[in-house]
């Protein structure tokens, strides 16, 4: 399925790793490094089924993003692919299109398995897959924690083409034999870096052992830490590599500013001063702990500011309702943590506030990547205390960007 290696050829791990690093460091002007050279400027040129094209255009895509121009076709050809691109570049639609193109719709068995690090992201992928496959009659189900096991078993028994899920619940369904792996021919790891940093490595390995041997593998990730390279080496067969240099991982069109806040205690007043500006548009405010989400929400409400909040301790139903209200625009300001950064795909968000700077530079990308998706303009404002100066410096160096002090006319920027 995945373009098997020639008989008897040994896979040279050291050579592969050194090649991978070379790819990451060559050529300053190329947007992507890839061993697959074809670029398709239009969805119509990709040889996709008519009903898949209908779904793509109905979803609102007009022209493929850079990663879609390179990444959809090799996936459709059954090749193993490693695709590295930042949030908001259309990674999800890339692998969804590749999967939808290859399914046998006459066979109502699970043929593709997609793993994601959080429930929110898994449910987001399920929505995109269902929307793009609307005219194909695709059956998709999200297997995630916090939902009924029995309901999962019922839906899987009734037959689905694609399962999207978090590693824990997917492994559980495989172990119970509620999810049968016999017909699975495509396996995708989305946000692989995040899954590994959350300690899902063993579960991913366990799941892989239960899948058929000749399987197509896609790894999608914003960053490529060594553990992600290790996964590609263990599970992938001569993968096509489509990579973005780290310096280009920041998003175009997002203006980034900082506000000097002398002490942690003064952040709240600073946020309240900005509230009128926040409510003009839709905004997401990031803090670093669940407890702080609750604390900040209470403080804002006690000052008569309308905000909604979501974090990992809330039950799934509550989170779904809050996200629905936010997506529909009935709620304008959302307070949350990194856990949910990757699941918030809200088109209207044009302002992100990092009330707390992220604890590692990589997460900065996933937070501000929520504003200005697909070339939309956006503004990110970072609250910086003396203790945060080092992290601000690290973020600027990591992404090769300059973050300037917030001007007085912030409302004009939105």
Swiss-Prot record:
Reaction it catalyzes: ATP + H2O = ADP + phosphate + H(+)
InterPro entries (alphabetical): DEAD/DEAH_box_helicase_dom, Helicase_ATP-bd, Helicase_C-like, P-loop_NTPase, RNA-helicase_DEAD-box_CS, RNA_helicase_DEAD_Q_motif
A Pfam family this chain is assigned to: Helicase_C
Annotated keywords: ATP-binding, Cytoplasm, Helicase, Hydrolase, Initiation factor, Nucleotide-binding, Nucleus, Protein biosynthesis, RNA-binding
Placement of sequence motif Q motif: 41-69
Gene Ontology molecular-function annotations: ATP binding; ATP hydrolysis activity; RNA binding; RNA helicase activity; translation initiation factor activity
Disulphide connectivity of cysteines: none
PROSITE patterns: DEAD_ATP_HELICASE (PS00039), HELICASE_ATP_BIND_1 (PS51192), HELICASE_CTER (PS51194), Q_MOTIF (PS51195)
One GO-annotated biological process of the protein: cytoplasmic translational initiation
Domain Helicase C-terminal, residue spans: 253-414
Enzyme Commission (EC) number: 3.6.4.13
Motif (DEAD box): 190-193
GO annotations of cellular component type: cytoplasm; cytoplasmic stress granule; nucleus
Residues that coordinate or bind ATP: 85-92
Keyword Protein biosynthesis: yes
Location of the protein in the cell: Cytoplasm; Nucleus
Predominant place of localization: cytoplasm
SUPFAM superfamilies from the UniProt entry: P-loop containing nucleoside triphosphate hydrolases (SSF52540)
Domain Helicase ATP-binding positions: 72-242
Subunit structure: eIF4F is a multi-subunit complex, the composition of which varies with external and internal environmental conditions. It is composed of at least EIF4A, EIF4E and EIF4G. Interacts with DRM2 (via UBA domains).
Family to which the UniProt record says this protein belongs: Belongs to the DEAD box helicase family. eIF4A subfamily.
Function recorded in the entry: ATP-dependent RNA helicase which is a subunit of the eIF4F complex involved in cap recognition and is required for mRNA binding to ribosome. In the current model of translation initiation, eIF4A unwinds RNA secondary structures in the 5'-UTR of mRNAs which is necessary to allow efficient binding of the small ribosomal subunit, and subsequent scanning for the initiator codon.
Domain notes: The Q motif is unique to and characteristic of the DEAD box family of RNA helicases and controls ATP binding and hydrolysis.
Stated name of the protein: Eukaryotic initiation factor 4A-3
Organism, as annotated: Oryza sativa subsp. japonica
Lineage, broadest ranks: Eukaryota, Viridiplantae, Streptophyta, Embryophyta, Tracheophyta
